[in-house]
Amino acid sequence: MRSKDKNEILTLLRIHVRETLSSYLRYTEETYTQITDGFMNEDLKPLRKADSKTDDQRKMLKKRRRKEILGLRRIPIAIAIEKNTWFHLGSNSCEQMLYCLKRILDPCKEHVDNNFNPIQKACIDEFLPIRQELCNLMERTCKAIDSNDYTDADDILKKGDDLKNKISFLRKEQMNRMQESANATLKASLVYLNILQETQELVSIWRHLLRASRFFQADYVSPQDAQVLSLEE
């Protein structure tokens, strides 16, 4: 983004931001799977790897954000004012996804490292379809951002909202089970409940990220569209 042409800088900035959002979304999907696999399989190695990689990703995100902010300051002022909100919403969403991974990872790593009782098979069986649906939607989101084609964005957002409702139901079911379960499985049950809570939060975060990308890449965002975004979760 060393060009002196403001319009060219805007084009390059949009490409750079797309690459940032899609790469962090893809990293989150892959690492989320790695963490939950490590917990369900009682395998400490992938959990340790995820811990180290996520710290590195946080450092890299700060570097990318600094570069993009410099680019934002060099585009036409009217466009910069319009895009500022969506840029920061997208960047903050990337950061929040990494924090969400850490909040899932830490209890899983501690649980496996201490050789506590494993999660019940019934919980795994109900969780895996939810995880697959989450990953499928995140992949669709990556595809929309990579191609800069948001034709399916509304459908993705709707299915994401439906997924949040499914996870909410599982959370309630899990809390009911915990009240009736033996103390021997309580620790694993608490970790699983945390996974469900953070998974629900993760859905909210990447839905924000998709909206942010769509509005940042758009040539014009109407006040009505902006108001719709501010009223949604």
Regions inferred by a protein language model and the residue ranges of each:
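Cytosolic, long alpha-helical scaffolding segments
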Residues: M1-E233
